[in-house]
Curated annotation (Swiss-Prot):
Residues 231-393 form the Helicase C-terminal domain. ATP binds at S53, P54, T55, G56, S57, G58, K59, T60. Belongs to the DEAD box helicase family. DDX55/SPB4 subfamily. It comes from Caenorhabditis elegans. This is Probable ATP-dependent RNA helicase DDX55 homolog. The keyword Secreted does not apply.
């Protein structure tokens, strides 16, 4: 339903929460949002809920507040788990815990997280030795723990009051269904369940995976039935594929006082463009996070970006959900997201809590149909803007600069190649391939936007007919060295070993070939001596016979020399031979 909360409903909700929770809430928050009142009321009335609400609307508190009250009413023992919250990433889990913590401290409840990045044994030890009242977990890690200690987890979960699935639209893969089925087998059926997302939770059948019964639908929509906040302005810039990097950098340079978040398609892309951007943006604060960063590194980078006034963060989709940084001015998407719904989540990192924000996606000429696709499928309208300071000359100058950067360090050269490969692999898997297919992608242009010196061989590109348009660099890439002395020393050692092995292999092949030819000639010579024939011309037969005889003479000479060396011949015999 789409609704505005009236004063009576608001008053009733406040009364249901009780004074202790209200005391904590009123210290940190100004007022309740619609989604918090609507979903919270249903949960406190012991109904399951499916909640769709825009990013930045306060969805986390929408389940935290009723959850805390339900646990408070249940009067659990110190070791009883009263709530389980499943979220798709470590960052989201950390964000949720930070919201829960003040309320948990007030009620003397303990909160723990179970996510990837830690050893499973450590998680199991925590369950055995610690009291946990609220568990925040990623489904994959909880599934792993259940595989080891199902009885222990089932015993701990027997008092569960509420199951929350945060960012529920992300949980629609087959693997997740297997994980969810195992998790549900460990928790009581008599519980409440809440599904929360910024975009529509999938079909009715998908809800059965989560064990919902007669769920109440809560939909807090923005104008045009959009999942994006009304204070968010969405734009696109059309450019040639080979100019994307240049357009992105020029756009950032024009906005020296703005905080900007840029989404790239893969961890490899983030690593590569961080190296490029740090050499192109001067003293501008630059940060980077991706799924393969360590937890401490990610946390420190996110905090530093949050504290900055005009920082630039390069990221994968680990920053697309749940990371609450209120003052991001611009979100840039370097290319199409894997799923169109992710556009909404990415863009939702700006324009939070009523603040104005802007989102931009870089669209190559062959991708223009994506603009209408977003409007039709996600109700997101994009307006076109220009980047007037960019032109072909600047793009080529940047490409040459990027090449020099790669030549200065082999590690960056290799990072660029890996980034390009990951980009193509990611593009092949997005959900609008009917209108933006890999076959239509300007691969050569994309390679130039990465400033590649060589086009890597890829299965996805094996049938392309346009790759000969790529201008291969004359630079000998094998001579490019690592800037890191240890890496370069190791590379030289490996290259030397490979060269020696290659020489040995070639020598062995040559020896084998010569031995084979000798055996063949000897065999042919034997046939001629025995009066055999091969049906060849007389000249060829004579030549083969001559070679065979020469080979026999050579073998006789070798045997004779060996006998002389061993002293097997008398002086007279040696004289006769000579």
């Amino acid at each position: 339903m789409t609704s505005k909360v009236g004063p009576v409903a608001l008053k009733t909700f406040r009364e249901k929460l009780g004074p202790e929770l209200l005391e904590v809430f009123d210290k940190s928050y100004k007022s309740f949002t619609d989604v918090q009142v609507l979903s919270g009321t249903h949960l406190l009335n012991l109904s399951d809920v499916v909640v769709e609400s825009p990013t930045g609307s306060g969805k986390t508190l929408a389940f935290v507040l009723p959850m805390m009250r339900m646990i408070q009413n249940a009067k659990l023992q110190p070791a009883d788990i009263g709530a389980l919250i499943l979220s798709p990433s470590r960052e989201l889990c950390s964000q949720i815990v930070s919201v829960i913590q003040p309320f948990a401290e007030k009620l003397n409840l303990t909160v723990e997280t179970v996510t990837g990045g830690q050893k499973v044994d450590k998680n199991i030890k925590m369950f055995k030795n610690k009291n946990v009242n609220i568990l925040v977990a990623t489904p994959g890690r909880l599934f792993q723990i259940i595989q080891h200690e199902k009885t222990l987890i089932a015993r701990k979960m027997r008092t569960l009051q509420l199951l929350v699935i945060d960012e529920a639209d992300r949980f629609n893969e087959i693997q997740f269904e297997d994980h969810m089925r195992e998790i549900l087998s460990c928790i009581p059926k008599q519980r409440r369940t809440g599904l929360f997302s910024a975009t529509q939770v999938k079909e009715e059948d998908d809800l059965m995976v989560f064990g919902l019964r007669n769920a109440k639908q809560v939909k807090v929509a923005q104008e045009r039935n959009s999942a994006a906040p009304s204070t968010l302005k969405n734009y696109y810039v059309e450019c040639r594929a080979d100019e994307k990097t240049s357009v992105c950098l020029e756009f950032i340079r024009q906005r020296t006082d703005k905080k900007i978040l840029i989404f790239f398609p893969s961890c490899n892309s983030v690593r590569y463009f961080y190296k490029i951007f740090e050499r192109c943006l001067g003293k501008r604060p630059l940060f980077a996070v991706h799924g393969k960063c360590s937890n401490p590194h990610r946390a420190s980078q996110i905090k530093a970006f949050s504290d900055s006034t005009n920082g630039v963060m390069i990221s994968t989709d680990v920053m697309a959900r749940g990371i609450d940084i209120s003052d991001i001015d611009w979100v840039i998407q370097f290319d199409l997201p894997k799923h169109s719904s992710w556009f909404v989540h990415r863009a939702g990192r700006t324009a939070r809590c009523g603040r104005e924000g802007n989102a931009l996606i870089l669209i190559a000429s062959e991708q223009l149909a994506y603009v209408n696709f977003l409007d039709n499928h996600e109700k997101v309208k994009l307006d076109e803007i220009k980047v007037p300071t960019n032109n072909s000359r600047k793009s080529e100058e940047l490409r040459q600069k990027m090449i020099k950067i790669q030549v200065s360090d082999r590690a960056i050269l290799e990072a660029g190649t890996r980034a390009f490969v990951s980009h193509v692999e990611s593009y092949a898997k997005h959900d609008c391939h009917l209108i933006c297919s890999l076959d239509d992608l300007n691969v050569v242009g994309l390679a130039n936007s990465y400033a590649l010196l060589r086009l890597p061989k890829m299965r996805e590109l094996s049938q392309r007919k346009d790759l000969d348009m790529f201008d291969r660099s004359a630079i000998e890439t094998s001579e490019i060295k690592y800037a890191d002395v240890k890496l370069e020393a190791n590379r030289e050692t490996v290259m030397k070993e490979k060269h020696e092995k290659k020489v040995e292999t070639l020598a062995a092949k040559d020896k084998k070939r010569r031995e084979k030819e000798a055996r063949k000639l000897k065999k042919m010579g034997g046939r001629f001596r025995n009066g055999g024939g091969t049906g060849r011309k007389a000249e060829e037969k004579k030549a083969l016979k001559r070679k065979a005889e020469e080979e026999d003479d050579a073998q006789n000479d070798i045997r004779l020399l060996k006998r002389i060396k061993r002293g097997k011949l008398s002086k007279k015999e040696i004289k006769d031979v000579l």
